[in-house]
Amino acid sequence: RTLRCAAAVPSARKGARPMLDLNHVSMTFNPGTVNEKKALTDINLHMESGEFATIVGSNGAGKSTLFNAIAGSFIPDTGSILLDGVDMTFQPDFRRSKAIGRLFQDPLKGTAPNMTIEENLALAYLRAGTAPHAIFSRISRKDKEVFREKLALLDMGLEDRMKQPVGLLSGGQRQALTLLMATLVTPKLLLLDEHTAALDPATAEKVLELTKSIVAEKKITCLMVTHNMHQALELGNRTLMMDSGRIVFDVKGEERSRMTVDDLLEKFRENAGKNLDNDRILLSKVEK
């Protein structure tokens, strides 16, 4: 691979600079082999500060790969990734983590099971570079008060269990805690990769309501992958559809507010030239 020099790329939009600005981002895995896969192809995505976009797509469409590119899991073959005007294309993931919060589908991924609830929250401060002393010395009384206050907002009784190891919590409790950790220090960008898909319906709904509340209160720029078509149209203010590593449809505003699930599926057929290949998404047509 030829090493490219990082350079700021002007936004395609006029006026205020986007919070997230992807320009011509492409990525091919295992090039020149029988396992070659074009994972992302010429992705252009510009998101304003505070914008909340949902993402749906076919199986293997590149949704998680897009998140990995933004989070710094790999350097794309071509293109640039800017966050709040700063070129992060070549920055490693641990540097980007100070500005980017992320939740995965697996509720066990975002927490340290052998550490207590309060230690995990202190770790979130450390990730953001806010209080590097918190992990290596006694957690202050002030920090504990903040943690207790934030945990109480989850309405799961975790504020009374701060000394307990996180490994004793349920999947829903751990995912709610991960959401709190990812937003304890407000990130510039929040990536939600089907973060309620592995939870039971009641818990998923609770975590989703917490998500909506936190994102709205803190005005966080957010991208959320979902397999639920109703959620894709009801949450946030913008919806993207992906297929074969491309963004094939992007809708917001009045057009989005008028759309039904059937309209969205028809738009996919028009733009991708095929039916949506994702059983979970098709089943979600009848879910609410």
Model regions: which residues?
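ABC ATPase NBD coupling module
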Residues: D87-G101, K109, P113, H133-S140, ...
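The feature captures the beta-strand-to-loop junction immediately N-terminal to the Walker
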Residues: V56-S58
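Helix-to-loop junction immediately C-terminal to a conserved catalytic motif
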Residues: A71
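H-loop/switch region of ABC-family ATPase nucleotide-binding domains
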Residues: T226-H227
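Conserved ABC transporter NBD signature motif
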Residues: G79-D87, F249-V251
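ABC ATPase nucleotide-binding domains
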Residues: S257-K288
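A short, flexible loop at the N-terminus of ABC-type nucleotide-binding domains that lies
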Residues: M19, T28-D42, P92
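ABC ATPase C-loop
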Residues: A182-T183
